[in-house]
């Protein structure tokens, strides 16, 4: 929409005619229609402004950007102002309703559910009243005349109809609630693929081994590596000890002649000789030494 509107400029010049153009939710104004090609003097986005009419003058209206700016405008007559108000309001409503289809569906479903809930409350009140009426008919005192069959039938039919309507409305509420809370309406976006785990740094491994002493594989491996080296280092010492022990045993004679003799290096026919002399052999040798030698005849 486009046309002439008077715009308030200042106290010196007062109201000045301007050419206004409303396009795609933006209201732009120019000095005249011929100056449209030169560029606008100003523009207003309808989505962020409020429309206000003058309470006394039926040709004036205001466009207010909260906390920033006021635009005072006046039409030629009341009918022209009404045309502009309808166009500006429609443009603002179309721009304001920028919700997605899913959000609109949720909002409409919520409104429908609220309406059905209010209907249920109304039918519940009607049911209570009708049940109370029937109870009065049944428990009427003897001094009152007995209720007619027609009145009882009418009350019963009303109660039955109200119950049916209540049940139908309740079923509709359940359907709306199921549609409102269906999973696809609130489906979350798929999560991003997981990032491959990063191997821990040596510093982290040392911290873990310090905090968990039972699982220090690195220390065990270091100990197993150090042990062969120390064993190799001790091997020559063991050999030296064995050599020195055997040498000292061979060099020093036994103090007791009755003590068993150790033969470390003597062999008989390639086999090791007995390490000790049997007791019978020693006795035989002793008796032979004690017997006198007989002269040869």
Swiss-Prot record:
Spans annotated as Interaction with SACM1L: 1-100
Protein origin, superkingdom: Eukaryota
GO CC, alphabetical: Golgi apparatus; membrane
One Pfam family cited in the UniProt record for this chain: PH
This protein's UniProt keywords: Golgi apparatus, Lipid-binding, Membrane, Phosphoprotein
Cellular compartment(s): Golgi apparatus, trans-Golgi network membrane
Region (Disordered): 198-297
Annotated stretches, region: Interaction with VAPA and VAPB: 97-297
Membrane topology: Peripheral membrane protein
Coiled-coil portions: none
Phosphoserine sites (modified residues): 244
Primary localisation category: Golgi
Annotated PH domain residues: 1-93
Molecular function (Gene Ontology), one example: identical protein binding
Low complexity: compositionally biased ranges: 215-224
Function noted in UniProt: Plays a role in regulation of vesicular cargo transport from the trans-Golgi network (TGN) to the plasma membrane. Regulates Golgi phosphatidylinositol 4-phosphate (PtdIns(4)P) levels and activates the PtdIns(4)P phosphatase activity of SACM1L when it binds PtdIns(4)P in 'trans' configuration. Binds preferentially to PtdIns(4)P. Negatively regulates APOB secretion from hepatocytes.
Subunit structure: Interacts with GTP-bound ARF1. Interacts with SACM1L and VAPA and/or VAPB to form a ternary complex.
PANTHER family referenced in this protein's UniProt entry, alphabetically: PLECKSTRIN HOMOLOGY DOMAIN-CONTAINING FAMILY A MEMBER 3 (PTHR22902:SF27), SESQUIPEDALIAN (PTHR22902)
Record remark: domains: The PH domain binds the small GTPase ARF1 and phosphatidylinositol-4-phosphate (PtdIns4P) with high selectivity, and is required for its recruitment to the trans-Golgi network (TGN).
Protein name per the record: Pleckstrin homology domain-containing family A member 3
């Amino acid at each position: 929409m486009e046309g002439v509107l008077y715009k308030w400029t200042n106290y010196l010049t007062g109201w000045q005619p301007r050419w206004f153009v409303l396009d795609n939710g933006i209201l732009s104004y120019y000095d005249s229609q011929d100056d449209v090609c030169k560029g606008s003097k100003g523009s207003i986005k309808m989505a962020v402004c409020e429309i206000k009419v003058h309470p006394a003058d039926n040709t004036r209206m205001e466009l207010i950007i909260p906390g920033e700016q006021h635009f005072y405008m006046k039409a030629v007559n009341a009918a022209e102002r009404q045309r502009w108000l309808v166009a500006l309001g429609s443009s603002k409503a179309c721009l304001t309703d920028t919700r997605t289809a899913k959000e609109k569906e949720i909002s409409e479903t919520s409104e429908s559910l609220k309406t059905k809930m209010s209907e249920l409350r109304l039918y519940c009140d009607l049911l209570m009243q009708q049940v109370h009426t029937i109870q009065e008919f049944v428990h009427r005192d003897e001094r009152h005349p007995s209720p007619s069959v027609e009145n009882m039938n009418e009350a019963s039919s009303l109660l039955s109809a109200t119950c049916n309507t209540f049940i139908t409305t309740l079923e509709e509420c359940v359907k709306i609630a199921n549609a409102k809370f269906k999973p696809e309406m609130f489906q979350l976006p798929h999560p991003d693929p997981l990032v491959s785990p990063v191997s821990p740094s040596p510093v982290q491994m040392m911290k873990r081994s310090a905090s968990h002493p039972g699982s220090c594989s690195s220390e065990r491996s270091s100990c197993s590596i150090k042990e062969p080296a120390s064993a190799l280092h001790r091997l020559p010492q063991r050999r030296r000890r064995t050599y020195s022990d055997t040498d000292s045993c061979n060099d020093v004679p036994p103090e007791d002649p009755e003590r068993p003799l150790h033969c470390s290096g003597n062999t008989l026919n390639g086999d090791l000789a007995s390490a000790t002399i049997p007791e019978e052999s020693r006795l035989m040798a002793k008796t032979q030494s004690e017997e006198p030698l007989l002269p040869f005849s």
